[in-house]
Amino acid sequence: MNKSHAQKVIAIFMVIAMMFGALSVIPASAADSDSGADAAYADSTQVSEAHKEMFGTYNRTLAEIEDMINAISYHDYNLKYAEVPKAEQTVVIRAADYIPEETTAEVEVLHDYEGVPGPSLKMGPTGKTTWHVNIPKTGRYAMRITYIPYVGETVTTIERMLYIDGKLPFSEARYLYFPRSWEYVLNEDGSFDIDIVGNDIRPIRQQRPIWNTYFLRDWLGFTIDPFEFYFTEGDHTITFVGAREPIIISTIELYRYEPEMSYEEYVEYYKSKGAKIIETTEPIKVQAENPYLVSNACLYPTNDRTSALTEPQDPAVIKYNILNSSVVNQWMRYKVTVPESGFYTIAARFRQNSLIGMFTSRRIKINGEIPFREASFLRFKYSPDWQSKPLNDGYTDFMFYLEKGENIIEFEVVLGHMVDYVYRVGQLVRELNAAYQQFVMLTGPTPDAYRDYGFTRVIPGAVRTIGKAAEELYQIADELEAITGELGDQVATLNTHAMLFETMAEDEYEIAPNFVTFKNYIIATSNWLYASLDQPLKLDYFVIQGVNDPLPPGKANFFQAAWFEISAFFMSFTMDYTTIGYRYDAVDGKQIDYRGEVEMWIVSILGRDDALIQRYLIDNYFTPYSNIAVKIKVISAGLTEAILAGIGPDIANMNSTDTITWGLREAVEPLNDKEGFDDVITWFDDAAITPLTMENAKGEVLTYGLPTVMAFYMMFYRVDTLAELGLEIPRTWDDLYTILPVLQNKHMQIGLPTGLAGTNIFLYQLGGELYADGGRRINLGSNIALEAFQKLADMFRKYSCPVNYDISWFRTAQMPILIADAIGTYNTLMGFSELRGLWEMAPLLGFKQDDGSINITSPVTVTSVVIPRGATDPDATWEYMKWYTSEETQIRLAKEQLNVSPNPTTKYNTANINALLSLAWTEDEYKAVSTQLKYLVGIPEYPGSYIVPVHVNNAFLSVYNDGANPITAMQDRIIDIDKEISRKRKEFKMDYLEISYRDSYAVESKPEDNLAS
């Protein structure tokens, strides 16, 4: 949408004003009376005050919102000041010299910290810290920070925002990330631990806090060089605003940045100093899986069995023999000792079989310095096979000067020559999304293919955007084909998208018929962008060798490959690849006498990753302290059958429905009599325990499992879209009803759960319950339940909310408000880089109560850990369950889940409340999540409960598809639900109600009259 700057400012002012209750939302109907408007104003003010107490996270200033919406990109910022000369001298700011009266962060001045003399400043994870700086001369200054990470409870990436003179210089300054340093914990000889089977054990990655000097740059990799900031001569302020994690800073330097010398200049420079070329020497091989430092804990060694030449290799057991990296700005460092100074060739054995027809890029640093300009553009071309090549940029094989003795060689993941193309495609995606929104506002998401909308007359700018995108994509595809020398998948994808965009731009009557495909191609273009941001490379080893020495072999010959495959085939008959055994069963040759042993089966679609995390935690934090061994098996299916047959594992995970059903069948053990049970359940919200607890046929109220993961609903919204439309962020359903006409007028949608999930949200917020009479019958016939179902149905019938949608609707702003699973949706959205800063999460919408509070209750679903019938040692299993679900272990588990995720902000949906709140949330995220956690409800599981979602979903679909009356549609299914509940209760020998089709529970009755035993 094209708006003037004045229009945007007015829209932003309206948002701020409404946030503070200064304005009400404009009534949907112009016919509203003055008194109605006054009432709406008073009501809005009252709700706003209640929200301030409950939510309290949306107090942005007008300037902050304006910065967020209007901040230019660094690309445009750099062009704007391109003619400004570079800095002539360095300006150093001591971090300890902050301005106290302009600092809100928790700060502490440290002295001589970790070997750095003088003062340094520790800053908390949130709040702002401001410094004064005097600039001697107007110019462009790069900025580098000398810092050390603070080792605390959480270990996500350190994140800050940068403001200069109180303003955001460009949009990328909102996301500055400071990497940590990690090291592997290895045996004294540098080898990995092995388990009792002989497989390598993934090494522990422990944080190694060291001082770093880091130049500020784009964390997504859209720039190879550091940011350059424009400063005028005179006094200025620099402010860091904390988003995640504490940090300790020694100095902030503003300096003149100059690109490195060229490769030719580099060679000539060292030759002029007498450096010689090492023609031949004994090769120095460095195994990639053994770096001495890495930037992310998710950079861990993995196993490759695709080649007999990968080192080390074993046809029988798992050996970690490669390092696989892909995320921009990740790095790994290696120590290399050379016998003499001179120019060497660095050759790598690698495999890049992911980006077909393309190359991935790396930057090499030697002793902390980029040796020459081309060293930031190393290429590793596509091939399905392993390769062995000297480091090169696609044109030249490089030599590198190394000093005699120890050298540090660092490989960093960069976009290399793809930087310009990725940036251009990113800009196109943003422009195409804006054009798509304009089309949707005119036609809706599914325009009539035979209608003349007059696109070129009504929204000519959007049509021109499509044409421009086609031209740009064709040009990018041609340039990529030229530099790669082939028409790969990625180039072909761009050409395909360009063809459609070209067709639509040249003939406006092709827009409506191809509109759905147009949307899909925008998403596909965005996915192309993400694929390009990913720079996968499997590295086996690299060799420091003479420039004339032969390269190490890349691909195994026929006999090597055949022998390896034959050996692996015969070994497969004797090796157990499903068991991930404990680290040792003997110490100094003496068998360990464990006091208990637990066997656990993991059904994992993620392969061995989940099991390896469990193995690491158990071996380091459970077995050494409990003297209980845990055996882990990774299986693909068969858990249910094994447990029911009594031959399953000692511990298992299952959903709440199965937990109760199997508990009633005595297939899993109740936990109430276990030692410490009453204390353990206090670790969880009552809502998480309720679905795992039930009264059995003997009248005993028993809990059959402990919750491990928990899902609940929250609201996600597009800040930019609501601000641009001048709409306040809704807090109640009434707020939503008020803004829906505005959204619908723009053909925008709201995302809501359907069927039983959606019904339960309204039902429990209105004060109802799903079951009545202790689970003997369904409560959907009550007035509250029927009202809840009516409200859900109205959202889809009257307000046309879509039944089928996906996260891409939110991504394109076609759906600016989405109610969905909190943690899963959060993790997904954090992966969409183009949405950085454009969305937020908030507590669920709710109903205002008489006291002015808002009921934002969210139903909860849980997965539990249980003790199956036939467990060999239930007491040992219970000890493991207590340890596993404890706050300390769940925090460690969350860290390990983060360590295997390339997304530095990934969250783990633990059911342990304290552990969940201990994750590295931003201040606003923490307030939103902690607020929602106060309003959770667990829905009990009863015999026959499996049938409820089937009938409720059918009732919902009959209303949505066939136009049935919601009340009638629900009432028609109540008897069938009750009959199934009674049938299952009878099967379990529990009290039940005799149900007939003549019975009706729409009116008050005494269920005891129909009670049977």
Label every PLM stretch briefly.
Residues G36-I544, D549:
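Extracytoplasmic
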Residues A37, Y41, Y421-Q427, L432-T661, ...:
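Conserved N-terminal structural module of periplasmic/extracytoplasmic solute-binding proteins
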Residues T574-G596, T659-M714, Y737, L838-G852:
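Hinge/lid segment of periplasmic solute-binding proteins
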Residues I618-A687, D720-E728, Q814-I817, M830-E834, ...:
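Extracytoplasmic "Venus flytrap"/periplasmic binding protein-like
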Residues G663-E666, D686-I729, D734-Y737, M748, ...:
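Periplasmic solute-binding protein
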Residues G775-V803:
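Glycine-centered hinge/linker elements that transmit conformational signals in sensory
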Residues D794-E879:
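Extracytoplasmic/periplasmic substrate-binding proteins
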Residues L844, K895-S958, M990-A1012:
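Long, aromatic- and glycine/proline-rich binding clefts that accommodate carbohydrate-like moieties
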